[in-house]
Amino acid sequence: MDLAALRTQQQQLAASVERADRLDRDPPALIGGADVGFEQEGEITRAAMVLLTWPELELVEYQVARVATSMPYIPGFLSFRETPALLAAWEQLSQKPDLLFVDGHGISHPRRLGVASHFGLMIDVPTIGVAKKRLCGKIGDLGDEPGALAPLMDKNEQLAWVWRSKVRCNPLFISTGHRVGMDSALMWVERCMRGYRLPEPTRWADAVASRRPSFVRWQANHS
């Protein structure tokens, strides 16, 4: 595993990330959500992808792809491990979303190329990173109340918004993936909340991936 070459590739790709809004359809008709996990002790990478209508946020399609894991877990290089399964799930979708939420980081990454940015570049679709844990950078003062907001900074560069979406919950790290500005990323996440910690696109992707009761009920109603 030539990490130096991968690091160089990350830096080159990161330079191509568009940090301003460029949605082909605004407002979007379909918003996607993507979530990646691992099965069989990491040997299989599983990606779940969902499509929701906007503004209703109703689930209209889901796909799950499983591929053999192509590289080990190496912090900072997770996107190389996750994108093959994401691409497989993406290609299975009968329609493509106008905006995609990815469970993971966008530019809030040591080399500014988290999975949301990497995958957004691969498919050239507007993406937003919605991560649950900090990867790098420093958080400003963040209140305990729901809606509390602080920037995630690295020196003078803002990497994400840190946003407490729900009371007594850890905050989310919301960042530009590709073709979505930082403030727009936050705005779209806020618009896609329905009372849970996660926005609906990644909440549904997680529900599909983990076969949570909400998804099992949805399947029963749509069979």
From Swiss-Prot:
Entry EC number(s) = 3.1.21.7
Gene3D superfamilies per UniProt: archaeoglobus fulgidus dsm 4304 superfamily
Q: Where is this site: Interaction with target DNA?
A: 73
* Molecular function terms, GO-annotated: deoxyribonuclease V activity; magnesium ion binding; RNA endonuclease activity, producing 5'-phosphomonoesters; single-stranded RNA binding
Entry's localization field: Cytoplasm
Per the UniProt entry, what are the Gene Ontology biological process annotations, in alphabetical order? Answer: DNA repair
Q: Name one GO cellular component term.
A: cytoplasm
Source organism's superkingdom?
Answer: Bacteria
Provide this UniProt record's keywords sorted from A to Z. Cytoplasm, DNA damage, DNA repair, Endonuclease, Hydrolase, Magnesium, Metal-binding, Nuclease
Q: Which residues bind Mg(2+)?
A: 35, 103
Enumerate the cofactors the protein uses.
Mg(2+)
Q: InterPro entries attached here?
A: Endonuclease-V (IPR007581)
Signal sequence bounds: none
Per the entry, what this protein does is: DNA repair enzyme involved in the repair of deaminated bases. Selectively cleaves double-stranded DNA at the second phosphodiester bond 3' to a deoxyinosine leaving behind the intact lesion on the nicked DNA.
- Protein name, per record: Endonuclease V
Species, as recorded: Klebsiella pneumoniae subsp. pneumoniae (strain ATCC 700721 / MGH 78578)
Gene name, Swiss-Prot/TrEMBL: nfi
